[in-house]
């Protein structure tokens, strides 16, 4: 079985949610125009927020997988093209809303989040704003286990 994967090399701007989201949307649309048989697009760590920031900046940028605007916007493109999308984002815990994670979400072909990986070994600067995850989740898809 052959799987067509596109890996996005983008440089997000710290704190500029709209710019970062537009860059991601443009990349998805361009990829699907040029390579319509793409099945999975993978974006980098913290693609929606930018990387080096303060606790306050990440608190303002964080979202949950249930109600995040970026989840919905990227999910709508996953559903439109029938593809899987992975991207990194600062995740807010749904129960303990002051707890943040450096996470990656897998969006399915219907545009819904399948699950989240929370970075297990954050670097020293990341530890100022995010908590370490403790699992290595695997997700069953029609492409195989991801």
What are these regions, as identified by a protein language model?
Residues 1, 79-86, 98-100, 132:
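Short, basic and Ser/Thr-rich N-terminal targeting/leader segments
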Residues 1-38:
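N-terminal active-site segment of His-dependent metallophosphoesterases
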Residues 2-16, 42, 103, 116-118, ...:
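Active-site-proximal beta-strand elements of phosphoester/diester hydrolases
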Residues 11, 47, 90-91:
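Catalytic metal-binding/acid-base residues of hydrolase active sites
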Residues 20, 31-59, 78, 85-86:
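Active-site beta-strand/loop signature of hydrolases that rely on acidic residues for catalysis
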Residues 66, 76, 93-146:
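Active-site catalytic loop in hydrolytic enzyme cores
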Residues 67-92:
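A short, hydrophobic beta-strand-centered structural micro-motif
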């Amino acid at each position: 079985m052959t799987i067509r994967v596109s890996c996005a090399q983008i440089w997000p701007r710290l704190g500029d949610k709209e710019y970062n989201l537009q860059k991601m949307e443009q990349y998805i649309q361009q990829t699907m125009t040029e390579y319509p048989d793409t099945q999975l697009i993978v974006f980098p760590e913290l693609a929606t927020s930018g990387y080096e920031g303060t606790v306050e900046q990440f608190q303002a940028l964080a979202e949950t997988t249930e109600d995040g605007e970026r989840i919905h916007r990227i999910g709508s493109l996953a559903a439109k093209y029938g593809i899987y999308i992975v991207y990194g984002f600062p995740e807010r815990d749904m129960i303990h809303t002051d707890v943040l994670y450096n996470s990656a979400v897998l969006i399915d072909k219907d545009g819904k989040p399948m699950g989240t990986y929370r970075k297990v070994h954050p670097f020293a600067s990341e530890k100022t704003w995010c908590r370490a995850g403790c699992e290595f989740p695997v997700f069953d898809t029609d492409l195989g286990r991801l």
